[in-house]
Amino acid sequence: MESAASHIIVRTPVIDSIGELYETRGLGKKSVVLFDENTRKLYGDKIIASMQRQGFRTVELVVPARETSKSVSTAWKLYGQMIETDVDRSWNLLCVGGGVVGDLGGYIAASYYRGIPVVQLPTTLLAMTDSSIGGKVAINHPLGKNLIGYFHMPALVLIDPAFLRTLPAREIFGGMAEVVKYGFIADRKFFDMLAEHWDEVTRLEEPWISDAVSRSAFTKADVVEKDFRETSGLRATLNFGHTFAHGLEKMAEYRNLRHGEAVTIGMACALYLSYRLGFLAEAELNEGLALIARFRFPRNLVNKRFISLDLEELFDAMHSDKKKIDKQLRFVLLDRIGHAFLHDREVPKADVLHAIDDAQRWFSEKR
């Protein structure tokens, strides 16, 4: 497999050189451009005009800006639009948006004509640092999130931190969950930088925000390159906090709780579980929680979507997670800040429930 990092370009403004960048990857200038309703309104005219000036032929597709767009019915509709406009395997697909557009577009690209190239142009912090990188693309099923999909590496990931300036604070803090995750699982120095310059990063100040985005993106790319299909357990460490998070998202019926918010809560649960099982020292537990305490949530969200939840119901919801094997939940844990591992033994249910309860109590005290 080619280096995942070699496909990542971090540049402002990135769209002005898209033709040149496509040429470096051997991509043609016939592009289906997939937006959601928000990204089409914010960036669509500028992106399409720039591409056409650079000699591109484009077909635009637009989907609603919500998680429910990641569905078989939406994909089927988009396939039809592509067929009707004579899109063949000589085309590529450019995804302009956050995780929903990136996942949906990647899924369509992986399956259309048995696979056409996909280029990711992420516009959210979460997509820039996580979902656009690594080639995992999927749609949802009523019984679980991201259950139907492919591994389909993007030909390019074009990251422009300037897009972040249009985002509300809730989106920034949601994206910071994945940024902080990389410090927890792989880079103690990065964790320390985030702790020291949290305000500058979350205010999108330079050079801090570009540094945080770049380090996150290239950390994920490095992990993906070493374990593309999750055979060694290394790539699974990218799911730190996610087993809990997917249960939270399912209980919220994939509404009113952003993925990054669920991951933030999930990381607190995972810290407590790492400590309860004897892997993480108390001092590092507290250090990790201190950084999580700096996240901001909408009023009453944590109480409604986590603190008030029944432990048993959340535990049951977690079993829809893709990381379980033979109905056994698998957890990514820390043995120190900066190093994670996939715990390949069954964790007693009582310990999982205690960790959730500890996190509920901690969040309750912090609110």
UniProtKB/Swiss-Prot annotation:
It holds the Pfam family DHQ_synthase. One of its GO terms (biological process) is aromatic amino acid family biosynthetic process. Transmembrane segments: none annotated. It catalyses: 7-phospho-2-dehydro-3-deoxy-D-arabino-heptonate = 3-dehydroquinate + phosphate. Binds 1 divalent metal cation per subunit. Can use either Co(2+) or Zn(2+). Gene3D superfamilies: 3.40.50.1970, Dehydroquinate synthase-like - alpha domain. GO terms for molecular function: 3-dehydroquinate synthase activity; metal ion binding; nucleotide binding. NCBIfam families: aroB. Catalyzes the conversion of 3-deoxy-D-arabino-heptulosonate 7-phosphate (DAHP) to dehydroquinate (DHQ). PANTHER family: 3-DEHYDROQUINATE SYNTHASE (PTHR43622:SF1). HAMAP family: DHQ_synthase. This is 3-dehydroquinate synthase. The lineage of its organism: Bacteria, Pseudomonadati, Chlorobiota, Chlorobiia, Chlorobiales.
